[in-house]
């Protein structure tokens, strides 16, 4: 086990929008180390969002992430011979990471032609409270609510 917690590295703001969130999204979209391709996808999707809404795409993205971020999640806790799903609050950094992960995961499962279209539409859906990534958050909250009886097994 690690002696100390690994230090958090500062996130470099992206050159186009000057936003840390966009940098994190680029890194989540990244596959096989092809960063320029990931940047092209993210910037293309954000341009499409701006085209469709006329609003600053970073604000749209942040609104979408706000709708995806979970407040609670369940973690497995072994007590005696039984494993309980214990609801715990999600730290802000983890909530952000989960939101980005779910956004990209469900973007990849969409049926539009290009990744740019998929990402743009998933961001717009999430910003409007629709889409698979928002449903995932609701499911996570339902799980936590269903297992509320085990909340006293907290860490």
Curated annotation (Swiss-Prot):
Protein biosynthesis as UniProt keyword: no
GO cellular component: small ribosomal subunit
Pfam families found in the cross-reference section: Ribosomal_S7
GO molecular function, one term: structural constituent of ribosome
SUPFAM superfamilies: Ribosomal protein S7
Gene3D superfamilies named among the record's database cross-references: Ribosomal protein S7 domain
Transmembrane region(s): none
Keywords: Ribonucleoprotein, Ribosomal protein, RNA-binding, rRNA-binding, tRNA-binding
Single GO BP term: translation
Iron-sulfur found in the keyword field: no
Self-association state and partner proteins as the record states: Part of the 30S ribosomal subunit. Contacts proteins S9 and S11.
Similarity field: Belongs to the universal ribosomal protein uS7 family.
HAMAP family, A to Z: Ribosomal_uS7_B
Function: One of the primary rRNA binding proteins, it binds directly to 16S rRNA where it nucleates assembly of the head domain of the 30S subunit. Is located at the subunit interface close to the decoding center, probably blocks exit of the E-site tRNA.
Name of this chain's protein: Small ribosomal subunit protein uS7
């Amino acid at each position: 086990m690690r002696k100390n917690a690994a230090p958090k590295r500062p996130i470099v703001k992206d050159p186009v929008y000057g936003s840390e969130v966009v940098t994190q999204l680029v890194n989540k979209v990244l596959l096989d180390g092809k960063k320029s391709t990931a940047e092209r996808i993210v910037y293309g999707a954000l341009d499409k969002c701006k085209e469709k809404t006329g609003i600053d795409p970073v604000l749209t993205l942040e609104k979408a992430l706000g709708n995806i971020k979970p407040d609670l999640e369940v973690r497995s806790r072994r007590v005696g011979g039984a494993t309980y799903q214990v609801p715990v609050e999600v730290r802000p950094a983890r909530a952000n990471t989960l939101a980005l992960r779910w956004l990209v995961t469900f973007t990849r499962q969409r049926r539009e032609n290009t990744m740019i279209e998929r990402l743009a539409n998933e961001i717009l859906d999430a910003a409007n409270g629709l889409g698979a990534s928002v449903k995932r958050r609701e499911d996570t909250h339902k799980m936590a609510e269903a297992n509320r009886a085990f909340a006293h097994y907290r860490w």
